[in-house]
């Protein structure tokens, strides 16, 4: 086997021999190979004759392997490995031969290639001289001139010798394989019987596999979602708890208010019941015999009462004023009024308290009932009252000439009494501030006593005119 320098020299000689003919130019790889070989020759110093100190003065030589792998390019795309071996025969000694068909994705540059690793470097030159530029023909008769050059990658794949496996070709005798075949056949029968069941089983298996398959990133995302969900649940619970607390406070406030209102209502009802009991107790007390309860409220405190001698007497509020007969002397009523005033005041005050509440409930209803069912009787009574009022009024007018202004006031009171009798429902007259009583500002039974003023005055007129008990019964 020749050295690398000899091989390079032979290659250069061959190239020089072929150069003048103009058959083919050198490839770029060959030119690089020549340059590398020249640089190697220039760098190697000449060996010295003396052996002393030769090892220390020599530079370290780089080990370079000889190029032995060759590639044949631009072969026809339809060429096969067998056809290429037939055309390359006789092929020098080699330990590596690999053929690669054309790649259709590189159209229109569709070429096949082959790699050969020669054992003897001298055979490389002979092979190159023989097949570099050799024209290969395909099935269609197209010519493809080949190109022979050193392979860029000189290493070759080593074929490792493997021991033959003892179990090769014995799978049919394996008991596990036989068991698998049995279960597989049974599953095929079930599948043919019910495909929906198989589909459900496949989906379940797929879901199970997906559930089992996990990564740290998926675990982190899952934990993050669970944490966020937990925080949301806590916030929701806190908000619900606050709302329940507010609702509870509102309910307590409402319940407390209802309790207060209930207590107030009970208190007011209790007071009303006590007042009603007191009124009933007062009503149960009967007035003394011979006394006629009156509820007439005087319109003026200290109202002047007409007396027989032309004098005026102040009457206390709530006192009953009875008209004296105008036909008799005026001195006799004056004496009787002085003697019975004290007793009358006491009796009137006691009777007012007892009958004020009873009259308040029954007077208005009785008057409405009588006015509704007896309009003829009311009209006839009003005519009689007007006729009766003329006689006493004229007598009073005659006697009033002798008195000093007293008959004028009596006439006015008589006219008011007649108006009250004529009207179906008596109306309360408003009092001026100057006419209101100074001491007794509030009188509980004043309104109802004012409504009864008509009946009492009719009694007074009956007594003054001397008509007797008949007219008094009609007035009642």
Swiss-Prot record:
Stretches the record annotates as Required for association with EIF4A3 and ECJ core components CASC3, MAGOH and RBM8A: 421-434
Residue ranges with Basic and acidic residues bias: 21-38, 250-304, 340-401, 410-437
Stored InterPro entries: Nucleotide-bd_a/b_plait_sf, RBD_domain_sf, Upf3, UPF3_dom
Positions of modified residues (Phosphoserine): 341
GO annotation, biological process: in utero embryonic development; mRNA transport; negative regulation of nuclear-transcribed mRNA catabolic process, nonsense-mediated decay; positive regulation of mRNA cis splicing, via spliceosome; positive regulation of translation; spermatogenesis
Top-rank taxon, per record: Eukaryota
Tissue specificity annotation: Isoform 1 is strongly expressed in testis, uterus, muscle, fetal brain and spinal cord. Isoform 2 is strongly expressed in fetal brain and spinal cord.
Keywords: Cytoplasm, mRNA transport, Nonsense-mediated mRNA decay, Nucleus, Phosphoprotein, RNA-binding, Transport
Residue ranges, annotated region (Required for interaction with UPF2): 66-140
Annotated region (Disordered), positions in chain: 1-63, 250-476
Family statement: Belongs to the RENT3 family.
Function of the protein: Involved in nonsense-mediated decay (NMD) of mRNAs containing premature stop codons by associating with the nuclear exon junction complex (EJC) and serving as link between the EJC core and NMD machinery. Recruits UPF2 at the cytoplasmic side of the nuclear envelope and the subsequent formation of an UPF1-UPF2-UPF3 surveillance complex (including UPF1 bound to release factors at the stalled ribosome) is believed to activate NMD. However, UPF3A is shown to be only marginally active in NMD as compared to UPF3B. Binds spliced mRNA upstream of exon-exon junctions.
Protein name as it appears in the record: Regulator of nonsense transcripts 3A
């Amino acid at each position: 086997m020749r050295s690398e320098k000899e091989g390079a020299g032979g290659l250069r000689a061959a190239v020089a021999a072929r150069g003048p003919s103009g058959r083919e130019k050198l490839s770029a790889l060959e030119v690089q190979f020549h340059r590398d070989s020249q640089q190697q020759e220039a760098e190697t110093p000449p060996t010295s004759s003396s052996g002393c100190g030769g090892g220390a003065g020599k530079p370290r030589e780089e080990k370079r392997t000889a190029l032995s792998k060759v590639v044949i390019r631009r072969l026809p795309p339809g060429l096969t490995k067998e056809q290429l071996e037939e055309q390359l025969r006789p092929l020098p000694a080699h330990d590596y031969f690999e053929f690669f068909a054309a790649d259709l994705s590189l159209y229109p540059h569709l070429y096949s290639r082959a790699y050969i690793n020669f054992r003897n470097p001298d055979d490389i030159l002979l092979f190159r001289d023989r097949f570099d530029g050799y024209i290969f023909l395909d099935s269609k008769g197209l010519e493809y001139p080949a190109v022979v050059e050193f392979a860029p990658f000189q290493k070759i794949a080593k074929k490792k010798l493997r021991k033959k496996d003892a179990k090769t070709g014995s799978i049919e005798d394996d008991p596990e394989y036989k068991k698998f075949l049995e279960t597989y056949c049974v599953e095929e029968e079930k599948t043919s019987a019910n495909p929906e069941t198989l589909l459900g089983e496949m989906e379940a298996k797929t879901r199970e596999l997906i559930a089992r398959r996990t990564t740290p990133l998926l675990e982190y995302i899952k934990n993050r979602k669970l944490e966020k969900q937990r925080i949301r649940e806590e916030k929701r619970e806190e908000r619900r708890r606050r709302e329940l607390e507010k609702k509870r406070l509102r309910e307590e406030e409402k319940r407390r208010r209802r309790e207060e209102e209930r207590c107030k209502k009970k208190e007011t009802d209790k007071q009303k019941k006590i007042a009603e009991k007191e009124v009933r107790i007062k009503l149960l007390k009967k007035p003394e015999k011979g006394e006629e309860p009156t509820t007439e409220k005087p319109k003026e405190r200290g109202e002047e009462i007409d007396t027989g001698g032309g004098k005026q007497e102040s009457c206390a509020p709530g006192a009953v004023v009875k008209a004296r007969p105008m036909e008799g002397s005026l001195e006799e009523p004056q004496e009787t009024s002085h003697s019975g005033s004290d007793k009358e005041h006491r009796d009137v005050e006691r009777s007012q308290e007892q009958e004020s509440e009873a009259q308040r409930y029954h007077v208005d209803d009785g008057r409405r009932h009588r006015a509704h069912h007896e309009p003829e009787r009311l009209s006839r009574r009003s005519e009689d009252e007007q006729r009766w009022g003329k006689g006493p009024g004229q007598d009073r007018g005659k006697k009033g000439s002798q008195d000093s202004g007293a008959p004028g006031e009596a006439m006015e009171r008589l006219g008011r009494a007649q108006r009250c009798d004529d009207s179906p429902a008596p109306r309360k007259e408003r009092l001026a501030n100057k006419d209101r009583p100074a001491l007794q500002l509030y009188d509980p039974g004043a309104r109802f006593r004012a409504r009864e003023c008509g009946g009492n005055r009719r009694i007074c007129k009956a007594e003054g005119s001397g008509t007797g008990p008949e007219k008094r019964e009609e007035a009642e």
